[in-house]
Amino acid sequence: SKVQYGIYSQGESRSNKNQGTVIQLNNIDLTSTANTAVAGVYLGFENNAQISGNTIKNISNSTKTVAGIALGLLPSLNMNVFNGNDVANSVISLNTIRDIARIGDGSAFGITMAAVIAGGSSTNELSNNMLFNINSTAATTMDYIAGILVGGGAVGTTKVLYNTIKLAG
């Protein structure tokens, strides 16, 4: 199959975010012989979202950067800008994310989170997730591989707690 996202949810704007989205207990397997997947779950402009108990696996692409869960930040080859469609006051927990691969040179991430840049105080929590086999098959010094990538920002707090990360298989 040729699908880019297992689950995609996008609010209208920073001032009109989706409220209370729940993504729970899904099995997202984007196995594709064409290597066309980008992310298992993508959320943008969300408030009070919960992503928990999901199994996300076999995300691969030969032309784009890939992620298991992307929160307001669609990964790019050059990860030096962390602003995006921010997700606020949300909990991402108890997910298993595995076999995320950029085929060839490029970047791959287990979980990405954009910086929260406006809207007052916000607390996001990434906890008790298990991430493994996150890789690029021909990474160069310009490529970026990370289990969890969190963009910094002046507004809000991000708690990264009790996750298990093993980049290799």
Regions found by a protein language model. Name each.
Residues 1, 16-32, 47-61, 70, ...:
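Right-handed parallel beta-helix
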Residues 2-15, 33-45, 62-84, 103-117, ...:
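Extracellular beta-strand/beta-solenoid scaffold signature
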